[in-house]
């Protein structure tokens, strides 16, 4: 059975938030007010000890607001905090190991443009899979851009929530009609605290309008 919470705007933090925790909390709260339903703390630098204070604070805010909180990669930290789940990439722990450690948690797996990897992830217990980069991405400029028809095929074959990621902005999000979540970084946080709520609402509105036409 699909987790019905896995839908909507999925915000992913920019790198280095743990170095500016007060701003990070403000950004998170503004995104939530704008309609963000899922948040992922993604910190590829810094130790678990350095990230722990911010992770705990953001998790508490998400819990109070009814927003899902996902940690990127850091499975041990996710277990110690008791957050909603983890997101794993190609170099992270396998979904099967994560499912053993998080029997009731959300496990997301990056599948890039690989449908076979998505099938394997589902078999190993993934809650959702992510495909991308959907468009050229300023966060990962070297990433290959996938064929968006992959989403329709995955929707037909997988029967688990699908997340689109990579280069998504208000001007192109309308092309993503066969996914459950849109994961964004740059287009959500650009402009800082004063702009985030507007960014979130704009992304959601553009996506919703185009999906309703289909």
Curated annotation (Swiss-Prot):
<feature type="binding site">
    <location>
        <begin position="137"/>
        <end position="139"/>
    </location>
    <ligand>
        <name>2-[(2R,5Z)-2-carboxy-4-methylthiazol-5(2H)-ylidene]ethyl phosphate</name>
    </ligand>
</feature>
<dbReference type="InterPro" id="IPR034291">
    <property type="entry name" value="TMP_synthase"/>
</dbReference>
<dbReference type="GO" id="GO:0009229">
    <property type="term" value="P:thiamine diphosphate biosynthetic process"/>
</dbReference>
<protein>
    <recommendedName>
        <fullName>Thiamine-phosphate synthase</fullName>
        <ecNumber>2.5.1.3</ecNumber>
    </recommendedName>
</protein>
<dbReference type="Pfam" id="PF02581">
    <property type="entry name" value="TMP-TENI"/>
</dbReference>
<feature type="binding site">
    <location>
        <begin position="40"/>
        <end position="44"/>
    </location>
    <ligand>
        <name>4-amino-2-methyl-5-(diphosphooxymethyl)pyrimidine</name>
    </ligand>
</feature>
<feature type="binding site">
    <location>
        <position position="167"/>
    </location>
    <ligand>
        <name>2-[(2R,5Z)-2-carboxy-4-methylthiazol-5(2H)-ylidene]ethyl phosphate</name>
    </ligand>
</feature>
<dbReference type="InterPro" id="IPR013785">
    <property type="entry name" value="Aldolase_TIM"/>
</dbReference>
<feature type="binding site">
    <location>
        <begin position="185"/>
        <end position="186"/>
    </location>
    <ligand>
        <name>2-[(2R,5Z)-2-carboxy-4-methylthiazol-5(2H)-ylidene]ethyl phosphate</name>
    </ligand>
</feature>
<feature type="binding site">
    <location>
        <position position="92"/>
    </location>
    <ligand>
        <name>Mg(2+)</name>
    </ligand>
</feature>
<dbReference type="GO" id="GO:0000287">
    <property type="term" value="F:magnesium ion binding"/>
</dbReference>
<feature type="binding site">
    <location>
        <position position="140"/>
    </location>
    <ligand>
        <name>4-amino-2-methyl-5-(diphosphooxymethyl)pyrimidine</name>
    </ligand>
</feature>
<dbReference type="GO" id="GO:0004789">
    <property type="term" value="F:thiamine-phosphate diphosphorylase activity"/>
</dbReference>
<comment type="function">
    <text>Condenses 4-methyl-5-(beta-hydroxyethyl)thiazole monophosphate (THZ-P) and 2-methyl-4-amino-5-hydroxymethyl pyrimidine pyrophosphate (HMP-PP) to form thiamine monophosphate (TMP).</text>
</comment>
<feature type="binding site">
    <location>
        <position position="73"/>
    </location>
    <ligand>
        <name>Mg(2+)</name>
    </ligand>
</feature>
<feature type="binding site">
    <location>
        <position position="110"/>
    </location>
    <ligand>
        <name>4-amino-2-methyl-5-(diphosphooxymethyl)pyrimidine</name>
    </ligand>
</feature>
<feature type="binding site">
    <location>
        <position position="72"/>
    </location>
    <ligand>
        <name>4-amino-2-methyl-5-(diphosphooxymethyl)pyrimidine</name>
    </ligand>
</feature>
<comment type="similarity">
    <text>Belongs to the thiamine-phosphate synthase family.</text>
</comment>
<keyword id="KW-0808">Transferase</keyword>
<comment type="pathway">
    <text>Cofactor biosynthesis; thiamine diphosphate biosynthesis; thiamine phosphate from 4-amino-2-methyl-5-diphosphomethylpyrimidine and 4-methyl-5-(2-phosphoethyl)-thiazole: step 1/1.</text>
</comment>
<dbReference type="InterPro" id="IPR036206">
    <property type="entry name" value="ThiamineP_synth_sf"/>
</dbReference>
<keyword id="KW-0479">Metal-binding</keyword>
<dbReference type="GO" id="GO:0005737">
    <property type="term" value="C:cytoplasm"/>
</dbReference>
<keyword id="KW-0784">Thiamine biosynthesis</keyword>
<dbReference type="GO" id="GO:0009228">
    <property type="term" value="P:thiamine biosynthetic process"/>
</dbReference>
<dbReference type="InterPro" id="IPR022998">
    <property type="entry name" value="ThiamineP_synth_TenI"/>
</dbReference>
<keyword id="KW-0460">Magnesium</keyword>
């Amino acid at each position: 059975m699909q987790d019905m919470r896995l839908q909507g705007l999925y915000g992913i933090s920019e790198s280095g938030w743990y170095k500016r925790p007060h701003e990070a909390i403000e950004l998170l709260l503004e995104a939530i007010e704008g309609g963000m339903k899922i948040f992922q703390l993604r910190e590829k630098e810094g130790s678990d000890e350095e990230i722990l204070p911010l992770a705990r604070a953001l998790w508490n805010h998400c819990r109070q607001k009814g927003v899902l909180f996902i940690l990127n990669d850091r499975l041990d930290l996710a277990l110690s905090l008791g957050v909603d789940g983890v997101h794993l990439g190609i170099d992270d722990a396998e979904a099967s190991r994560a499912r053993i450690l998080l029997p009731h948690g959300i496990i997301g797996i990056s599948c890039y443009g690989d449908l076979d990897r998505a099938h394997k992830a589902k078999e190993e217990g993934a809650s959702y899979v992510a495909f991308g980069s959907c468009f050229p991405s300023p966060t990962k400029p070297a990433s290959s851009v996938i064929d968006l028809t992959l989403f329709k095929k995955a929707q037909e074959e997988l029967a688990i929530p699908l997340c689109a990621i990579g280069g998504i902005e208000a001007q192109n999000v309308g092309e993503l009609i066969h996914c459950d979540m849109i994961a964004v970084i740059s287009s959500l946080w650009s402009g800082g605290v004063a702009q985030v709520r507007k960014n979130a609402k704009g992304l959601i509105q553009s996506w919703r309008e185009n999906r309703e036409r289909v």
